[in-house]
């Protein structure tokens, strides 16, 4: 559980906290994430990536006629990709929280959570297939950074 790991370490952290999920590979520019965080005035910044449909999206009218089709489009939603910046000022809230989702929802409700939009490469590794795909594509991620 993420929140437990953070709580176990937080008393040893003297500065702000940068948190990265361990099951994600990305070509996110960390310097730009930090710069966005500093300029935004938010106490917490999460990185987000556009949600891409796994399916073709079909628009249908009342008569059942297809009026539009897009194969695996980017949707108008963003997903958390697990790169966070927490100001030290929120450490007490972290200590008091019982779940990471609850904590992030609380920061959102307080208006202190910002979103850094990353539209580059993002690979999540939650399955054996995703791991295999990541292993095949990892070199292309680092070639693009150069």
Each predicted region: which residue ranges?
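Catalytic-core segments of class I nucleotidyltransferases/pyrophosphorylases
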Residues: 17-18, 25, 34-38, 50-53, ...
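Conserved beta-loop-beta/alpha segment of the NTase-like Rossmann-fold superfamily
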Residues: 1-60, 93
């Amino acid at each position: 559980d993420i929140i437990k790991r953070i709580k176990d370490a937080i008393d040893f952290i003297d500065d702000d906290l940068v948190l990265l999920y361990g099951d994600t590979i990305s070509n996110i520019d960390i310097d730009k994430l930090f710069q966005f965080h500093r300029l935004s005035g938010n106490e917490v910044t999460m990185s987000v990536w556009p949600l891409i449909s796994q399916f073709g999206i079909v628009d249908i009218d009342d008569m059942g006629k297809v009026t539009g089709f897009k194969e695996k489009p980017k949707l108008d939603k963003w997903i958390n990709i697990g790169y966070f910046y927490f100001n030290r000022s929120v450490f007490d809230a972290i200590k008091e929280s019982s779940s990471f989702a609850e904590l992030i929802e609380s920061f959102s409700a307080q208006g202190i959570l910002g979103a850094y939009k990353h539209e580059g490469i993002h690979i999540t590794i939650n399955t054996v297939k995703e791991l295999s795909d990541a292993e095949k594509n990892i070199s292309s991620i680092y070639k693009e950074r150069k």
